[in-house]
């Protein structure tokens, strides 16, 4: 199929999106999540292909179920034959060379998942491209779905460094949360990775005290041959030291506009990444020990043309009803109080907050809405790194702690 100059197929012009509104509370029914339900842990070890086989064998039924729901969601959103949409998306992009160059073991991991589940490699490959598919659809029309609120706090004498986020995803992923515990292998450190069955990464931490959380920045320029977000996350977490992790995030070509909050032992960093540049972001230049972000770029100006006007309104303060702006303001108000002790309890209170009921940081799963808090994650860095996470929104699920074996 012929491509346009940005590598996106012309078929997009025929798509008519049907996007449900996230905030139509009258049409949404809240679903209670059991507080006793924990995110299952799946142990992975060996090389990439072996890890993929283990992933698929452990979650074969769940992967079959969530792939079916994923395709139903695409069908609903596009009104087109879902297999045709996936095939056109696959042909319109060219991510494989970047994956093979920067994270070759992950390409083998996808082969292993396909082999052990019986799912086609094309389906397994495209399922990884959560943000990249949103970009593909956004080429035609902005669906208006905002996702994720995150922050990071550097270490002091009274507490270690933390990074944390509410990972907000589409409703069809509800119930398929998984925590991968990956053994160290061939120079790569031990890792804990939050994910969904069939997906290789959403965020995570390694045993050397390096962690990463992410936020979609749909407004930024994308690339049809860059490195996808899931692979960027795993690439960062494969590094043994901070210098290598920072070099990686700055060197690769990024497939999607994305904000990366990276914690390295005692320090925290925030980078807004687009196809053409990676820019470090400081919410307060006088306080580099605190970072926070939602879903609109604040320092990277590598914008898609159709976002220029709306971005001006957000940055000028005119768009005060913007979902991302409201959540960003909520984070700022909560995290910049002069008497904050930055205890774990404060982090949890922030992640559970609903300061604006229509635009909350914590999104309960509701039937009829598009997005919910898939999991809330607190990553503790330093000499004793760990992950705490919930199954779905943190107001309805308790945080469960997982620590590394040799720490």
Task: Please report, for each region that a protein language model flagged, where it lies by residue.
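Intrinsically disordered, low-complexity, compositionally biased regions/tails
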Residues: 11-13, 50-52, 154
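Internal mixed beta-strand/loop scaffold within catalytic domains of large alpha/beta enzymes
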Residues: 132-231, 244, 374, 378, ...
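Exposed boundary/loop context
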Residues: 2, 14, 39-41, 45, ...
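C-terminus-biased signal that marks the final domain/tail of proteins
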Residues: 27-147, 236-278, 283-407
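Bacterial Sec-dependent N-terminal signal peptides
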Residues: 1-30
């Amino acid at each position: 199929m012929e491509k346009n100059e940005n590598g996106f197929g012309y078929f997009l012009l025929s798509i008519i999106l049907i996007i449900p509104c996230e905030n139509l509370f009258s049409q949404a029914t809240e679903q209670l999540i059991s507080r006793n339900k924990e995110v299952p842990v799946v142990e992975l070890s060996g090389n990439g292909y072996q890890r993929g086989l283990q992933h698929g064998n452990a979650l074969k039924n769940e992967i079959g179920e969530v792939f079916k729901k994923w395709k139903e969601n695409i069908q609903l959103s596009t009104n087109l034959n879902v297999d045709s949409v996936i095939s056109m998306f696959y042909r319109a992009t060219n991510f494989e060379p970047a994956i093979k160059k920067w994270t070759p073991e992950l390409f083998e991991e996808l082969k292993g998942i396909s082999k052990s589940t019986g799912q086609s490699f094309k389906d397994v490959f495209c399922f990884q491209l959560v943000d990249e598919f949103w970009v593909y659809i956004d080429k035609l029309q902005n669906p208006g779905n905002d996702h994720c609120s995150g922050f990071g706090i550097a270490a002091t004498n009274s507490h270690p460094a933390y990074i944390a986020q509410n990972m907000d995803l589409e409703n069809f992923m509800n119930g398929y949360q998984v925590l991968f515990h990956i053994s160290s292998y061939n120079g790569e450190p031990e890792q804990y990775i939050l994910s969904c069955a069939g997906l290789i990464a959403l965020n995570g931490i390694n045993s050397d005290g390096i962690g990463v959380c992410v936020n979609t920045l749909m407004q930024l320029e994308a690339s049809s041959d860059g490195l996808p977000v899931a692979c960027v996350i795993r690439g960062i977490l494969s590094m043994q030291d901070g210098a290598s992790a920072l070099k990686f995030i700055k060197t690769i070509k990024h497939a999607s506009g994305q904000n990366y909050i990276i914690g390295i032992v005692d320090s925290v960093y925030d980078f807004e990444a687009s196809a053409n540049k990676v820019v470090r972001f400081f919410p307060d230049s006088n306080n580099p020990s605190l970072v926070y972000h939602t879903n609109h770029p604040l320092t990277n100006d590598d914008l898609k043309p159709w976002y220029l006007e709306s971005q001006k309104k957000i940055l000028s303060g005119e768009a005060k009803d913007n979902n991302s702006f409201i959540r960003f303001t909520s984070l700022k108000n909560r995290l910049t109080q002069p008497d904050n002790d930055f205890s774990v309890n404060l982090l949890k209170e922030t992640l559970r907050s609903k300061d604006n009921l229509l635009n909350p940081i914590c999104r309960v799963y509701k039937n009829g809405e598009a997005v919910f808090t898939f999991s809330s994650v607190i990553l503790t860095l330093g000499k004793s790194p760990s992950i705490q996470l919930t199954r779905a929104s943190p107001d309805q699920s308790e945080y469960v702690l997982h620590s590394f074996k040799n720490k």
